[in-house]
C-alpha cells in the first residue's frame, strides 16, 4: 500500500510532564485545545492565565507580569464600549465595572502565584509573528507597545507589522535567563501553532511561521537544558496532510486531527 503521509520524527528525549508537577501554558487558540486534552488527562496545568495570546512578544510580556510583576490595578485599565479592559488580557477578562474586571484579572494572577513554587514546565505556543502596536496613547497605553488583544478599538489605534527574528530574540533571551535563575529546574516546551493566518496570504503566513520556527530553533540551541521544541506544526502539515483533518474553515485542525 502506498504511503500517503510524510512521517515526522519526534525529538529523541522530549521532556515529560509529570502528574504531580505544576505546568503553565501560554499562547494561541491551539494551546487552548491542547491544554484541555492535557487537563482531561489529569495534568496540573493552567492554560492561558491572561487569555489567548498569539504572538511571542505578548506571551513574553504576560510571563513578565505574572511571574515578576504586581497585581493589576485601575492604572492598568481603560474603558471602551461599556467594558473595562487591559491590553494584556483577552476579552474574557473584560467587565462592565473596574472592580469586576480587576477581580477576574487578579484571581488569575493569584492562581499563577500559587502555582509558581511548584512550577516545572512552561508550554509556549507561538501563533504568528504579526503584532499590533499602539499608534498613540489615546487609551492610556505606551506608544509602540505590543498588545495582546485589540478589544475592537478603531483600526487607527494600532500599527500592524511582522516583527523580526532579532526583535524576538532580544526579548526572549534575557527573559529565559531570568526564568532559569528563579526556576533552575524549569523546562520550556515550545511549539508553533499549525493554524494558518491567511490575512497576508499564504506567503505572508509562511514568512510568519518561519520566523517562529527560527525563534524556537535558536532558543533550543542556546538553552539546551531548558528549551525544547515539539513539532506540532510539522505533525499537522505533514503527517496529517489531508483536508479531512481540517475544520470547515480549512484553517484550524479538526477534532479528528
Protein language model annotation of sequence segments:
Residues 1-257:
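Extracellular glycan-modifying ectodomains
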Amino acid at each position: 500500500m502506498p504511503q500517503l503521509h510524510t512521517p515526522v520524527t519526534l525529538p529523541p528525549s522530549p521532556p515529560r510532564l509529570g502528574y504531580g508537577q505544576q505546568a503553565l501554558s501560554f499562547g494561541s487558540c491551539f494551546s487552548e485545545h491542547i491544554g484541555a486534552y492535557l487537563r482531561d488527562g489529569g495534568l496540573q496545568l493552567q492554560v492561558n492565565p491572561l487569555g489567548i495570546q498569539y504572538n511571542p512578544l505578548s506571551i513574553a510580556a504576560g510571563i513578565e507580569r505574572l511571574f515578576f510583576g504586581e497585581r493589576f490595578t485601575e492604572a492598568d485599565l481603560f474603558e471602551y464600549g461599556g467594558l473595562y479592559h487591559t491590553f494584556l488580557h483577552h476579552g474574557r477578562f473584560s467587565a462592565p465595572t473596574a472592580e469586576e474586571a480587576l477581580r477576574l484579572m487578579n484571581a488569575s494572577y493569584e492562581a499563577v502565584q500559587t502555582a509558581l513554587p511548584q512550577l516545572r514546565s512552561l508550554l509556549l505556543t507561538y501563533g504568528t509573528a504579526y503584532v499590533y502596536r499602539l499608534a498613540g496613547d489615546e487609551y492610556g497605553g505606551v506608544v509602540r507597545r505590543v498588545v495582546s488583544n485589540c478589544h475592537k478599538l478603531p483600526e487607527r489605534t494600532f500599527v500592524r507589522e511582522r516583527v523580526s527574528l532579532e526583535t524576538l530574540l532580544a526579548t526572549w533571551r534575557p527573559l529565559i535567563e531570568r526564568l532559569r535563575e528563579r526556576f533552575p529546574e524549569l523546562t520550556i516546551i515550545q511549539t508553533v501553532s499549525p493554524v494558518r493566518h491567511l490575512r497576508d496570504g499564504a506567503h505572508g503566513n509562511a514568512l510568519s511561521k518561519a520566523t517562529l520556527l527560527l525563534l524556537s530553533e535558536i532558543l533550543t540551541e542556546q538553552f539546551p537544558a531548558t528549551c525544547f521544541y515539539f513539532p506540532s506544526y510539522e505533525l499537522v502539515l505533514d503527517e496529517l496532510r489531508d483536508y479531512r483533518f481540517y475544520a470547515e474553515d480549512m484553517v484550524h485542525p479538526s477534532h479528528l486531527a
